[in-house]
């Protein structure tokens, strides 16, 4: 069993190092960086803070009009959305939020502060403060931000004009996939590392080295590649270094997994079978008005996502009453980075209510 465990984690780490948008470095998953024009556009954004739900959340905004709110996932920050925000700022107040635990937002140290129900309440209070009470808004979300957005739509459908999800696991389908799909269980093994169940020889996160981590990440992999391509400027690179170097930001991001038992399900044959708690959709959606989402919803999905396999799309229409799906067959988990202009156009088109075909290919492609 020990040999199997070592081999599994070694193979998994190597596999994740090879894939384009991610690398596993010292137990931290380092994601790809948003391709964008090399000239600086940061002056277009206004930085601000909102005190909500017992924390101070940083956000960037651009434009005027009804609110469209962008939520990032792990291990990102608001800046991943800058191209989509600029597009939507032509007729919206486009806001990119630093979720709690990230970049310039508060970073509580207790795990309870990262429960999904707490994150949902962050979004509710923030949207009311920035967008106004009793005013509907559009919510765009990715990865962990998407998990929060799914649950938010179940609790507060009356607050949403539209919901746009980009490669983000639906709570109930995620639970099904890690229980029934062996490939998805294997793809989710990195979460054991995130939760502190390290592979032999793996080093735990050292928050005193965040500047070193941030600098190393930004000078290797896709950050450096995008700079060399001319999509990113040195100013863009430095923004990511600064975000990843914030004290507590590494642990803050990992606490999303730890607080919500984001583990593949317990079973006797799993190499980490001593972990008795796993993801519970029932727990994270408790108190929802309805687990069937009636808000008009667009799901954008990069089909080559190595972490969230396409099985997450199978049967999604049973949980979402008004669903449209846009597939990107050659993109991965970071489709909004790889296809930033196309995704911005998708968001624009869907928000404007233009004819957006309800693709059905995902039902066959997902299995």
Regions found by a protein language model. Give the residues of each.
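Conserved HGGG/HGGXW glycine-rich cap/lid loop of the alpha/beta-hydrolase fold
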Residues: 61-104
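Active-site helix-initiating loop/hinge in glycosyltransferases
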Residues: 73, 115, 338-339
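Catalytic active-site module of serine/aspartate enzymes centered on a nucleophile-bearing elbow/loop
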Residues: 322-367
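Short, hydrophobic alpha-helix immediately C-terminal to the catalytic nucleophile
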Residues: 82, 150-154, 344
